[in-house]
């Protein structure tokens, strides 16, 4: 495995601030964890402290491109565990758990919303917007400091489009759909290919390589049937006729 480094990763993505942050003890853990993660080339997504089965501190992290492999989680755990032991932000015994954001991940940064335009999201506002706090819909884009969604739960006489101020968002999470699963699998395969190239297990991309052209659909007639292929115009008969025409002869046909 090749761990990302601060020099190799995109600096702007690594240092991009989170819009959704934790309160209380989780905030103290985040203050310790985030510099460690950034130094390794990872981004902090979320800290969650659970009292189930004792105390579990979940640190959700990712690479700047949004991926996170098992090897990445293991590397973060080895680096972060001793730092947390020294800083001691929690006053009781706990179990440290490092995880990826998952497919139906939380959206905590502006770039998270940008990457998932076209996908379904559930948003809970910390500050009510249009007299409501909960919204659900398709992310259609960004407008300044707001995220644009098309709601799927509105009445017929209501405008489904709404722009939510990102600074007022308390929680945002993707909704698991077939399209989201397919997109996640595509990104995972791309990350795996990139890792193999980094390890020398796969050939690098050729500089002139181009994506395969998509097959064009056959033209359709009005009745829905495929159009017939036009007759060839460069047969031996056509060539002989052209020669006779050039010589001024009359084509018997």
Curated annotation (Swiss-Prot):
Comp. bias regions, Basic and acidic residues: 186-199, 240-253
InterPro entries found in the cross-reference section: Ribosome_maturation_RimP (IPR003728), RimP_C (IPR028998), RimP_C_sf (IPR036847), RimP_N (IPR028989), RimP_N_sf (IPR035956)
Entry keyword set: Cytoplasm, Ribosome biogenesis
Biased segments, Low complexity type: 201-216
Pfam families xref list: DUF150_C, RimP_N
Region (Disordered): 186-253
Lineage top rank: taxon: Bacteria
Keyword presence, Ribonucleoprotein: no
A cellular component term, taken from the record's GO annotations: cytosol
Gene Ontology terms: biological process: ribosomal small subunit assembly; translation
Localization per Swiss-Prot or TrEMBL: Cytoplasm
Family recorded in the similarity comment: Belongs to the RimP family.
Role according to the record: Required for maturation of 30S ribosomal subunits.
The protein's name: Ribosome maturation factor RimP
Species the sequence originates in: Bradyrhizobium sp. (strain BTAi1 / ATCC BAA-1182)
Gene for this chain: rimP
